């Protein structure tokens, strides 16, 4: 909004206001703005959640036993705090005439709405069921399909139906009319992947922040013809503004971590996990780096695969591959302490983030 106001009234492009024309400046400001908002609103927001929810998030009785004792009474829906900070900072610092910004923001909001409904039903019914799986997936597929078609329409015709591969520069897989389906699977898949990962204090938010940091850089490079040509990337004009969105996500995520660090004062809930995963998926689709997200978000992929493998193998043989799924619960059952699991997953996320960055140069 500030960029649009200044662009409309300052035609000289000189002095202090010229800074607003730099993506790096606005991205930094968006990150700091989101961080300040989340830190400032955190305590009163959590206090309000405690007053409304009273008993906090329902805890699964089939999960690790200590969760019932240690996590009972902790409020959920903390994802609303992330979204307030994220959207406020993005609306303030991004170019609001950019279609990619609106497509990603509305996708994030749609997934957040599905998560909010799920959290609300869990709290009102005092169980861990929430929205039925069929209804939830149907809403997610619809939102992500619309997002895929929208993002496809904003992409240059020569890349519109293409999927790029990491580590190779000239290989593009044409999907034709199937591309929106691919985008739908990517966005919905990562929405639920982050949801699976969000099972321990601080476990999901740091990998999200790391992925957002990587994709802030990718968005900036892909949206700039000079850098894209130098790195032999496929340029997508307009995606540079998503660096502002990703930077705001970093700030909002770090602010939330302040309150979600062990022992957590608040959980993000499905409101947060679904929306953040959907946001990452949408940015990856917009920048044509869907497969790179599978590397950067490898922790999310591993958590999801552990659930899929567990269900498939149990239905086939009646036995379990893991002591419990998702994967982080397997390590809990093995006797690992929660901080050790969380920090080791963070370390893995950092390494995977560096591997994702390496794909930009190793081509």
Swiss-Prot record:
Pathway info: Cell wall biogenesis; peptidoglycan biosynthesis
Reaction equations catalysed: UDP-N-acetyl-alpha-D-muramoyl-L-alanyl-gamma-D-glutamyl-meso-2,6-diaminopimeloyl-D-alanyl-D-alanine + di-trans,octa-cis-undecaprenyl phosphate = di-trans,octa-cis-undecaprenyl diphospho-N-acetyl-alpha-D-muramoyl-L-alanyl-D-glutamyl-meso-2,6-diaminopimeloyl-D-alanyl-D-alanine + UMP
Broad EC category: transferase
GO molecular function, one term: UDP-N-acetylmuramoyl-L-alanyl-D-glutamyl-meso-2,6-diaminopimelyl-D-alanyl-D-alanine:undecaprenyl-phosphate transferase activity
EC assignment: 2.7.8.13
Compartments where found: Cell inner membrane
GO biological process entries: cell division; cell wall organization; peptidoglycan biosynthetic process; regulation of cell shape
PROSITE patterns linked: MRAY_2
InterPro entries found in the cross-reference section: Glycosyl_transferase_4 (IPR000715), PNAcMuramoyl-5peptid_Trfase (IPR003524), PNAcMuramoyl-5peptid_Trfase_CS (IPR018480)
One Gene Ontology CC term in the entry: plasma membrane
Principal place of residence: membrane
A family per Pfam: Glycos_transf_4
Keyword terms of this UniProt record: Cell cycle, Cell division, Cell inner membrane, Cell membrane, Cell shape, Cell wall biogenesis/degradation, Magnesium, Membrane, Metal-binding, Peptidoglycan synthesis, Transferase, Transmembrane, Transmembrane helix
Cofactor: Mg(2+)
HAMAP family, A to Z: MraY
Record-stated family: Belongs to the glycosyltransferase 4 family. MraY subfamily.
Function: Catalyzes the initial step of the lipid cycle reactions in the biosynthesis of the cell wall peptidoglycan: transfers peptidoglycan precursor phospho-MurNAc-pentapeptide from UDP-MurNAc-pentapeptide onto the lipid carrier undecaprenyl phosphate, yielding undecaprenyl-pyrophosphoryl-MurNAc-pentapeptide, known as lipid I.
UniProt-recorded name of the protein: Phospho-N-acetylmuramoyl-pentapeptide-transferase
Organism: Gluconobacter oxydans (strain 621H)
């Amino acid at each position: 909004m500030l960029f649009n106001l200044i662009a409309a009234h300052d035609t000289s492009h000189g002095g202090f206001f010229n800074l607003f024309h730099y993506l790096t400046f606005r991205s930094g400001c968006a990150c700091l703005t989101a961080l300040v908002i989340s830190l400032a609103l955190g305590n009163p927001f959590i206090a309000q959640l405690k007053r409304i929810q009273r008993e906090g998030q329902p805890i699964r009785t089939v999960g690790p036993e200590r969760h019932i004792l240690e996590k009972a009474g902790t409020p959920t829906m903390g994802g609303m705090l992330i979204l307030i900070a994220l959207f406020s900072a993005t609306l303030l610092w991004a170019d609001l005439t950019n279609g990619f910004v609106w497509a990603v923001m509305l996708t994030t909001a749609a997934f957040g709405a599905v998560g909010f409904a799920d959290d609300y039903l869990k709290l009102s019914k005092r169980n861990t069921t929430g929205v039925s799986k069929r209804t939830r997936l149907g809403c997610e597929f619809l939102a992500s399909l619309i997002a895929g078609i929208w993002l496809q329409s904003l992409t240059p015709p020569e890349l519109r139906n293409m999927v790029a591969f990491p580590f190779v520069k000239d290989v593009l897989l044409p999907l034709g009319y199937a591309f929106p389906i691919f985008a739908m699977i990517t966005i919905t898949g990562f929405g639920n992947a982050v949801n699976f990962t969000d099972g321990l204090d601080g476990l999901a938010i740091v990998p999200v922040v790391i992925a957002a940091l990587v994709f802030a850089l990718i968005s900036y490079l892909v949206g700039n013809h000079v850098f894209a040509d130098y790195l032999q990337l496929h340029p997508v004009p307009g995606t540079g503004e998503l660096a502002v969105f990703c930077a705001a996500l970093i700030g909002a995520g770090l602010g939330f971590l302040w309150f979600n660090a062990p022992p957590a004062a608040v959980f993000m809930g499905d409101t947060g996990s679904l929306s953040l995963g959907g946001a990452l998926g949408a940015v990856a689709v917009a920048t044509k780096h869907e497969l790179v997200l599978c590397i950067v978000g490898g922790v999310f992929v591993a958590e999801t695969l552990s659930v899929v493998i567990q269900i498939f193998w149990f239905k086939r043989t009646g036995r379990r591959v893991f002591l419990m799924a998702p994967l982080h619960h397997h390590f809990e059952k093995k006797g690992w302490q929660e901080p050790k699991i969380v920090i080791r997953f963070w370390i893995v996320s950092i390494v995977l983030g560096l591997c994702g960055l390496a794909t930009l140069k190793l081509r």
